[in-house]
């Protein structure tokens, strides 16, 4: 048996295509394609179990509000599992960390209620740091401190 599990990683799901977004219909087609190939989505917590068959993982970085708007209903309706990694200091705010990027587009981050809806749908969340700081610029002690703050 092949123990490799594909991970489909996304940032933003939208009705427009831009630097870190994918159109929601393209996202739906990716997930449906994996299903047609015989794959079933799992969460990271499922990795502790004995995994049988073809599995894949769906992740979303940054917890953009459009993920709750487009992906959540689709995932919930089709009983797919997924994990959203949240920049905890930005809940209900905007993606300030990208503002120096030349293609910057201001995007709203999920609210606490949207995150609760995500969890109540049986989907997982994880930490994507406290404030999206570039961890390469930090020493080991500072990385650990910031990681603890984000949980």
Tell where the protein language model's regions lie, with residue ranges.
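Short, solvent-exposed loop/turn elements at domain surfaces
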Residues: 15-19
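Metal-dependent polysaccharide deacetylase catalytic core of the NodB/CE4 family, i.e.
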Residues: 5-14, 53-56, 76-151
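Residues within well-ordered alpha-helices
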Residues: 30, 71, 111-114
């Amino acid at each position: 048996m092949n123990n490799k599990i594909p991970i489909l990683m996304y940032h933003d799901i939208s009705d427009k295509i831009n630097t870190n977004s994918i159109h929601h219909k393209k996202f739906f087609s990716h997930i449906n394609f994996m299903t047609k190939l015989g794959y079933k989505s799992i969460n990271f917590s499922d990795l502790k179990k004995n995994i049988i068959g073809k599995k894949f993982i769906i992740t979303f970085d940054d917890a953009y509000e459009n993920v709750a708007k487009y992906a959540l209903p689709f995932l919930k309706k089709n009983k797919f599992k997924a994990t959203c990694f949240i920049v905890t200091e930005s809940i209900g705010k905007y993606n300030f960390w990208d503002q120096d990027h030349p293609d910057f587009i201001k995007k709203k981050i999920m609210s606490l209620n949207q995150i609760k809806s995500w969890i109540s749908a049986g989907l997982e969340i994880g930490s994507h740091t406290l404030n999206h700081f570039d961890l390469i610029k930090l020493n080991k002690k500072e990385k650990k401190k910031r990681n603890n703050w984000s949980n």
